[in-house]
């Protein structure tokens, strides 16, 4: 039992060390269009339990990557004529479909052969190519994925996100061109899962004959790995584009200051339900499948809903906003005296309130520092932006005195890496004090 507790504490320590020693970013990583040259190829991804998994993926043609998981986030503007030129070096035909986009035209690619598939035109195996063109008519968060043998090819990693920014208002800070969809920071949450046994079966057949399409019984599929943006926790907390994860460039570390608005672009690219839980506050769901939740044109998201868990469904996308101020916690989160000036977005009703009282006139006091064990993300004080010296032997990695809340799948087995906790579909949101720069 003590050994298990030690391993858990050690794993949590490593996770917090990675989070707190590296910067996050508040701009979604991706490539700008409207013309994209992609390739479908094979490679390996790493999971945080130390495993290496054979996978397929889309990547930018000409890049040094053997593949990318998930595929590059494609970023375009409303009204753009979008063209995707796909080349294929996999031993199977591959295609692309774009849920939410209308009148997609598929044609022969830039040199390789293509053929008609069940759903759309496909790039032939090994040397094929195909092109897709459509007009991005509506802003929002979308996905793209293989349209060929989807039960296997999406599982293998042929999936990615598509973001269409509005043509009006402030496209970088309004998700749908309406003031009520404004945000300060945006982050992508592409949710997926894998069964490593399926990947091992495909890999073994490729080692025998890399030119022949694999055959796999997908009825035996059982997921044991869960991802956000192609990484399992705690790797979700690493910086983007770290060199030891060359095929998994995207991280997920949302950060904001009190009173600011964070936009979550959530893409469910898998096949299981993933109830995504946001500790700290409810999210406001403003759009689903790239369509703002409004009752009539021009009203904005008047049908938005508030919840503490986004009930994500396979194939759907969601846009939700998250805010945090500390209002109503029962004390002044900044530790102000009554006459001190207000912080930006601070609740005046809470200003100057002492740390919570256990009964009228008797304030709650924390145990002596020598009598407690603090987590590494705890600054030593309950006040935002403040810190106290840790006790002897205690590691403290909260650089700015921020508040940390875990965001994760509420299906508990999905926050493991092949049954090793903590891991899987999990990250942290960081409430930073004002004055701390969020890139």
Residue ranges and their predicted role:
Residues 10-21:
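Bacterial N-terminal signal peptides
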Residues 38, 84, 96, 146, ...:
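Divalent metal-coordination and catalytic microenvironments
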Residues 90-94, 101-105, 111-172, 302-439:
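Extracellular/periplasmic metallocenter environments
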Residues 174-211:
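Compositionally biased low-complexity segments at domain edges in trafficked proteins
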């Amino acid at each position: 039992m003590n050994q298990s507790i030690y391993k858990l504490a050690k794993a949590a320590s490593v996770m917090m060390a990675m989070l707190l020693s590296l910067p996050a970013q508040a701009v979604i990583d991706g490539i700008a269009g409207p013309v994209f040259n992609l390739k479908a190829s094979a490679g390996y991804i790493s999971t945080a339990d130390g495993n290496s998994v054979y996978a397929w993926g889309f990547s930018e043609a000409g890049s040094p990557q053997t593949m990318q998981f998930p595929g590059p986030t494609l970023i375009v503007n409303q009204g753009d004529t979008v063209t995707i030129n796909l080349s294929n070096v996999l031993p199977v035909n591959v295609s692309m479909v774009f849920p939410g986009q209308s009148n997609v035209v598929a044609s022969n690619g830039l040199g390789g052969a293509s053929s008609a598939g069940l759903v759309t035109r496909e790039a032939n195996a090994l040397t094929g190519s195909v092109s897709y063109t459509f007009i991005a008519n509506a802003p929002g968060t979308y996905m793209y994925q293989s349209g060929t043998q989807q039960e296997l090819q999406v599982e293998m990693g042929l999936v990615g996100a598509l973001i269409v920014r509005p043509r009006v208002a402030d496209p970088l800070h309004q998700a749908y061109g309406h003031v009520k969809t404004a945000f300060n920071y945006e982050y992508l949450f592409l949710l997926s899962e894998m069964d490593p046994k399926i990947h091992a079966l495909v890999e073994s057949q490729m080692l025998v004959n890399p030119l022949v399409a694999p055959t796999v019984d997908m009825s035996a599929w059982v997921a044991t790995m869960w991802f956000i943006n192609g990484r399992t926790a705690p790797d979700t907390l690493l910086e983007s584009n770290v060199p030891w994860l060359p095929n998994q460039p995207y991280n997920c570390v949302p950060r904001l200051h009190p009173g600011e608005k964070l936009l979550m672009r959530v893409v469910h690219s898998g096949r299981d339900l993933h109830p995504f839980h946001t500790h700290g506050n409810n999210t406001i769901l403003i759009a689903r499948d790239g369509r703002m939740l409004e009752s009539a044109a021009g009203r904005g998201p008047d049908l938005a809903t508030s919840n503490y868990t986004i009930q994500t469904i396979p194939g759907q996308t969601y846009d939700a906003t998250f805010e945090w101020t500390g209002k109503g916690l029962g004390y002044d989160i900044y530790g102000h005296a009554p006459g001190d000036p207000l912080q930006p977005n601070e609740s005046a009703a809470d200003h100057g309130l002492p740390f919570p009282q256990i009964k009228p006139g008797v304030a709650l006091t924390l145990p002596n520092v020598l009598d407690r064990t603090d987590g590494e993300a705890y600054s030593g004080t309950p006040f935002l932006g403040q810190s106290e010296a840790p006790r002897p032997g205690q590691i403290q990695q909260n650089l700015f005195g921020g508040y940390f809340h875990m965001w994760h799948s509420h299906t508990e087995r999905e926050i493991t890496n092949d049954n090793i906790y903590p891991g899987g579909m999990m990250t942290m949101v960081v409430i930073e004090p004002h004055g701390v720069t969020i890139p």
